[in-house]
Amino acid sequence: MDITKLINLFAKLPSLGPASSRRIVLHLLRHRQDVMVPLAAGIRELEMHTKECTICHNLDTISPCSICSDKGRDQSIICVVEELGDLWAFERGRIYSGVYHVLGGALSALSGIGPEDLNLGGIVDRIRTHGVKEVIVATSNDMDGQVTCHYIAQMVKGTDAKVTRLACGIPLGGEIDYLDEGTLRAALSSRYVIT
């Protein structure tokens, strides 16, 4: 393969431009045995063994994935996320012990993404067959995320599960003076009782 072609392939990855891609390729060329060979083998193995979970659409080496298969997880709570990276953010924080449902995006009229383009189908089935009590909608706090949240709430309406949405507002360590009006409004309406 041509070196320039490899640089261009790396540049297609998120957050990597031509300069960063060039540095990565040069590093790989200088460290063929200790970096390039294991990296290539790892990518090949990942491509061969990664599966999409038939339940939640997570990616893992097994299906159902290790999260859906974990008997220690609370199967009565489903956290609906837009993307796989969102699931991994929750897992990294070790702040959630339920199961997930990865949509693969958000509804977007501007981008032409409708319900048929997302992994929405299994949510209601999971609620009915697994005794789900709560669906946490953890979509982005933008217009597309809010539309997606509303759509999911309508889907779930005829079931016994309650639908909750992540609170939004002041970030941890954030100063009120630096917040925009929308964030401050969201924080004010999401307030909770302390005493």
UniProtKB/Swiss-Prot annotation:
CDD domains: TOPRIM_recR. GO terms for molecular function: DNA binding; zinc ion binding. SMART domains: TOPRIM. Pfam families: RecR_C, RecR_HhH, RecR_ZnF, Toprim_4. Keywords: DNA damage, DNA recombination, DNA repair, Metal-binding, Zinc, Zinc-finger. A zinc finger (C4-type) spans 53-68. Transmembrane segments: none annotated. GO terms for biological process: DNA recombination; DNA repair. Disulfide bonds: none annotated. It comes from the Bacteria. Residues 76-171 form the Toprim domain. InterPro entries: DNA_Rcmb_RecR, Rcmb_RecR, Rcmb_RecR_Znf, TOPRIM_dom, TOPRIM_RecR. PANTHER family: RECOMBINATION PROTEIN RECR. Belongs to the RecR family. May play a role in DNA repair. It seems to be involved in an RecBC-independent recombinational process of DNA repair. It may act with RecF and RecO. This is Recombination protein RecR. It comes from Anaplasma marginale (strain St. Maries). The lineage of its organism: Bacteria, Pseudomonadati, Pseudomonadota, Alphaproteobacteria, Rickettsiales. The gene is recR.
